[in-house]
């Protein structure tokens, strides 16, 4: 039977495809006629925010993307960074926000699958994963269901595929009630001479479809991810893809085997907008046309239209340009792994994107205008307002600082994430040196005696809401600081920019200023952005999420035997604060969680100080002077030393200095670390800090089973541990909500 590929193009249909009237007018001018239904779908997919970055491209160009170790920056499936000895690390972070809210298990699972494919498409074997998750307030009726589904989906896919989850974040805020965020990160290892790109080369070469069969799942997924949610959200469930990690594992092995055979000219995974996006990107990058014959596409559903095949986001699929003489060898490899292998088209020299179905041409479009030359907007934006200064003396103190510390360390945002990461395989592959729960995840580099990689993912959305510029700087600085706190040298980063509707000038202003802050920090800290993703329209019924520009980074440890952890304190050690005393309580968790206030400015990030203090800490760790190290962030000094006490199972008696106790204990000033060292080493560190111009304070001594800070805090490590470990399992068991 003949499948109908025609449909009348009406204003309603155009609007349903997310195309504005001026964009449709541009299509008419480009092709000189009315588009076919399939062509309308192709334009819709390629010109939406998810694929084209049309609202953010202008600003993304301002980010620093090069450096002495950068082999491949943005524009490919993932970034590539040199780690010496002919090895490189390949990594990226990407969002799967909209699908995960609609169908949490599959949305999160396919988010993990998609980011792993981005990495192994480049020729790298995945070695580490992270995920940064944001959920609504704990007592919202959907939150527990969403947490459970997302965590199960992340674990279900990553564990079965066989990649360790080494880190991540989980936050709760009412601004995510209607739009959760699932940002997935993956990193892989490859050789310099084994990197594969998506740029097609050569005319008349076979275009090959690899992997799983195509079905209707995920049709329109990229378009859905470029729109706000409203009351019709349940109708969007069919646009969520379904993943199979075992097929993906076979695809990984088949691709790496094929790459080693020398058969691959270009390769691209099928992610957002599926066959459309992968074919267009390969052709447009290589200044070639592509002709596809859809009758050759392996399908698992009957009577699929050209539109459905072109826009399906079925998982575990790749598109490749192949050396013709290697066809039989390539096919044998994929058959061995039980995967589909089909020649579905060829490269051409006419820069046209042609799609044939049932002998009929259903699309014939200029390939460059779909890809590189998609519309780009300079959207109007508004400078974000500033919060009035908030001196610590104007912030109320609490009567009982021990109770305040217990409440904060047992709160939704600061409590242990053990419930989450124990559902992930953190040790598979056997190279994990630091698992989640510290400052950064660390894995050994396979085949190298001493080399290791450190990974962290960070952002403080409430800072970004108060001041997108400082918040953007702080996200980069904290990621850099977390990597540094292990002793690793931060090499490069990837950004995942999650914002509301860019058509609103105040939201666009958040995006512009956050990118500006990120760029300034990356330049100052030599931490270039080598890959990334933008997720806009994270709004429901007009309510936007907190601006959340997540930064994930990778660092290099030349010798993992000289590495710091947060739980290494020994009895008799001296604790030293490197960096200034706490003074800043604006936008702090102290203010938010104890007084339900969100006023004051975000903390200022002095990037020169960040660099100086961080480099000093790193050299102390690498010189073997440090037994434990932890950076200071949410909750300031008191939370940092409490976490070190919990992880070490040891108490400490400390003096935080003279001043306002709430600021000294809970101030969130930046560029600070706490280290522990033997008394002799602590003296040497203090002497060196003085010489290097790094502010420091000798805090006190490790020992006993209580944490005592000045005359304000006196609490047992057992009580701290109970509060810290208790909130998440109690919440998921339905025993509490909110900040109880």
Curated annotation (Swiss-Prot):
Its main location: cytoplasm. One of its GO terms (biological process) is 'de novo' IMP biosynthetic process. One of its GO terms (cellular component) is cytoplasm. It is an enzyme of class 6 (ligase). Pathway: Purine metabolism; IMP biosynthesis via de novo pathway; 5-amino-1-(5-phospho-D-ribosyl)imidazole from N(2)-formyl-N(1)-(5-phospho-D-ribosyl)glycinamide: step 1/2. The keyword Ligase applies. The keyword Transport does not apply. Belongs to the FGAMS family. This is Phosphoribosylformylglycinamidine synthase subunit PurL.
């Amino acid at each position: 039977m003949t499948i109908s590929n025609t449909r009348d193009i009406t204003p309603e249909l155009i609007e349903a495809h997310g195309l504005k009237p001026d964009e449709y007018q541009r299509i008419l001018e480009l092709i000189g006629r009315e588009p076919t239904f399939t062509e309308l779908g192709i334009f819709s997919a390629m010109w939406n925010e998810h694929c084209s970055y049309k609202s953010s491209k202008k600003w993304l160009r301002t980010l620093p993307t090069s450096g002495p170790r950068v082999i491949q920056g943005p524009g490919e499936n993932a970034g590539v960074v040199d780690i010496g000895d002919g090895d490189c690390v390949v990594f990226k972070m990407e969002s799967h926000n909209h699908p995960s809210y609609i169908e949490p298990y599959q949305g999160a699972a396919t988010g993990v699958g998609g980011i792993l494919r981005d990495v192994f498409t480049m020729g790298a074997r995945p070695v580490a994963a992270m995920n940064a998750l944001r959920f609504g307030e704990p007592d919202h009726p959907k939150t527990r269901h969403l947490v459970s589904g997302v965590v199960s989906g992340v674990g279900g896919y990553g564990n079965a595929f066989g990649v360790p989850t080494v880190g991540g974040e989980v936050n709760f805020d009412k601004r995510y009630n209607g739009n959760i965020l699932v940002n997935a990160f993956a990193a892989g290892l490859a050789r310099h001479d084994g990197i594969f790109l998506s740029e097609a080369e050569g005319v008349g070469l076979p275009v090959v479809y690899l992997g799983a069969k195509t079905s209707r799942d995920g049709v329109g997924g990229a378009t859905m991810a470029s729109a706000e949610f409203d009351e019709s959200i349940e109708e969007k469930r069919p646009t969520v893809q379904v993943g199979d990690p075992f097929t993906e594992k076979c695809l990984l092995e088949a691709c790496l085997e094929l790459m080693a055979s020398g058969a691959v000219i270009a390769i691209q995974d099928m992610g957002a907008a599926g066959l459309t996006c992968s074919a267009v990107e390969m052709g447009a990058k290589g200044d070639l046309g592509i002709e596809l014959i859809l009758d050759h596409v392996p399908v698992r559903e009957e009577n699929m239209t050209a539109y459905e095949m072109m826009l399906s986001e079925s998982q575990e699929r790749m598109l490749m340009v192949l050396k013709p003489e290697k066809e039989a060898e390539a096919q044998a490899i994929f058959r061995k792994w039980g995967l589909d292998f089909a020649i579905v088209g060829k490269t051409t020299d006419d820069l046209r994107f042609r799609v044939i179905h049932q002998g009929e041409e259903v699309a014939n479009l200029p390939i460059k205008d779909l890809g590189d030359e998609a519309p780009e907007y300079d959207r109007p934006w508004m400078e974000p307002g500033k919060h009035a200064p908030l001196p610590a003396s104007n912030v109320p103190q609490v009567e009982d600082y021990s109770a305040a510390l217990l409440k904060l360390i047992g709160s939704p945002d600061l409590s242990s994430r053990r419930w989450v990461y124990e559902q992930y395989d953190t040790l598979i592959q056997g190279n994990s040196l630091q698992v989640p729960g510290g400052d950064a995840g660390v894995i050994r580099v396979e085949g190298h005696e001493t080399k290791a990689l450190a990974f962290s993912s960070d952002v403080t959305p409430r800072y970004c809401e108060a001041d997108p510029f400082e918040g953007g700087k702080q996200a980069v600085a904290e990621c850099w600081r977390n990597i540094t706190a292990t002793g690793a040298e931060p090499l490069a980063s990837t950004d995942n920019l999650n914002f509301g509707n860019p058509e609103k000038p105040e939201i666009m202003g958040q995006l512009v200023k956050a990118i500006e802050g990120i760029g300034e920090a990356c330049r100052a800290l030599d931490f270039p952005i080598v890959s990334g993703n933008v997720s806009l329209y994270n709004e429901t019924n007009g309510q936007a999420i907190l601006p959340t520009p997540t930064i994930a980074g990778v660092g290099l440890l030349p010798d993992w035997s000289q590495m710091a952890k947060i739980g290494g304190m020994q009895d008799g050690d001296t604790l030293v604060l490197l960096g200034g005393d706490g003074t800043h309580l604006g936008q702090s968790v102290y203010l938010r969680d104890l007084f339900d206030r969100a006023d004051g400015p975000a903390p200022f990030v002095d990037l020169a100080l960040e660099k100086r203090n961080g480099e000093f800490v790193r050299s102390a760790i690498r010189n073997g002077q440090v037994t434990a190290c932890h950076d200071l962030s949410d909750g300031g000094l008191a939370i940092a030393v409490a976490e070190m006490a919990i992880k070490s199972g040891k108490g400490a008696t400390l003096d935080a200095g003279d001043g306002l106790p709430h600021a000294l204990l809970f101030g969130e000033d930046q560029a600070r670390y706490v280290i522990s060292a033997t008394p002799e080493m602590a003296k040497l560190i203090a002497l060196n800090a003085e010489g290097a111009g790094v502010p420091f304070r000798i805090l006190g001594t490790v020992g006993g089973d209580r944490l005592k800070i000045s005359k304000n805090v006196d609490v047992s490590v057992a009580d701290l541990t109970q509060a810290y470990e208790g909130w998440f399992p109690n919440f998921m068991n339905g025993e509490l909500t909110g900040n109880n």
